[in-house]
Amino acid sequence: RPPRSTLFPYTTLFRSVDEIIYTHVSNQNPDSLRFLHDCEKLLGKKITIIQSEEYSSVDDVIERTRCINTPFGAPCTDKLKKRVRMKWEREHPDHHTYVWGYDLNEKNRADRVCKALSDYDHEFPLIEHGLTKEEAHGIADKLGLKRPIMYDMGYPNNNCIGCPKGRMGYWNKIRVDFPEVFERRARQEREIGHSCINGVFLDELEPDRGNINTEIIEDCTIACQLLTWGK
């Protein structure tokens, strides 16, 4: 167990929060729930899990809406996260504050969020404490909290496996790590007639295209949901 001086600043942050909400999507790596329960133990606080009652998965959304991705974001974000969050907010009317995971290197993104969503209150604990994502992972490790396995596999975030917003390098890594997901998404592209990647279908993607280490794919979080509000 870490010494209290190490643990205290981070656990007290969450003890001052009324409720921690987690929007679950079945396409996420199952290890995400392990991480969630480990956080509950560390923080001594139950995390509320909410999930779509209308759609069962990203695949369900793609196949029923006949849409994979758009310039305004992927429909799975709207159906599986945005609408689920909005339903929870309607059932819990109040003035909510959103806590963002942007790190020290993402101040510009934080500024854009505050300007675009001025009706909400926002907190950026990593930026306020001068922490990068890597340093946050290091703190978690010192606290005995194992980060989600997708990071250890070389992915830049813990999005769903087979995120429609992924680029060439991402999809070529999915092809290797999760071939069944790659094949299913490639089939869905052909059935619908649109691709995840602009200009190329997955079944035409050359295995050496792209570099996941240099590509930018945002975390599929509330940021995706709020910044496409009304689109």
Q: What are these model-derived regions, one by one?
A:
Residues 1-12:
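Single conserved hydrophobic/aromatic residue that forms the stacking wall/gate
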Residues 11-231:
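Nucleotide-activated chemistry modules centered on ATP-dependent adenylation/adenylyltransferase
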